[in-house]
Amino acid sequence: MALRIVGHPCRRLIRSSSAFHTNALQHTRPRRAFTLIELLVVIAIIAVLIGLLFPAFRAVQDQAKRTQAKNDLIQIVNAVNAFYTEYGKYPIATDDSPIINNSGVMYTLRADPTIANGNPNANNAVNTRQIVFINPPYVKTDSAASRRSGVSPTDGQYYDPFGVPYRIKIDGNYDNQMPNPYTSNTGAGPGPLSIGAIAWSAGKDGLAPDNGGTANFNNSDDVISWQ
């Protein structure tokens, strides 16, 4: 009698546990996969976000290039002034006209004696003490369409981050009166500038006052050394 009484609850407990397990399996549902429409919606949202962020990304890139150009321009002017301090004259003869091809100035300031491209410093003729006043890097790709942020070994010019050679202007008359390449009081200072050397970048559009760009500085994307 005692054995039967003890055994009955055990059998009932086992049956109850088995029933609970079976019931849990019956209520388990398989995971539903994404439908094609849902995937298309997600892709569309991602495309919209990229479209919104891309202009901001490009703006950040452009600003970084402008900042680099500004630093390069200041270094160019400082190098020209350092040359004047060392030699008592400027590195190249000029009549205050913009130097569109800056290779002559750069050869001299870099103490490069290369006999090429009409280098005025060939055989160290100008920078006789062979002092390196500026030492920018060479361009990573030396092709006409890809020159950026450095000196081209081919033509000797110093290119801005936008792929255009830097413009330089030197007070060749030694009268401390530099004609401003931009219209007076349009954001780039007064008419004549009381300064010995200036430099500027034509900016992203590649246009400066001397090659079809606007002379109103406020309406341009140019970068200048003196402001």
Language model features with spans:
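N-terminal regions of proteins, emphasizing targeting and processing segments when present
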Residues: 9-10, 18, 41, 52, ...
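Residue-level recognition of conserved structural "scaffold" positions that shape functional pockets
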Residues: 14, 19-22, 58, 95, ...
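N-terminal leader/signal peptides at the extreme start of proteins
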Residues: 1-34
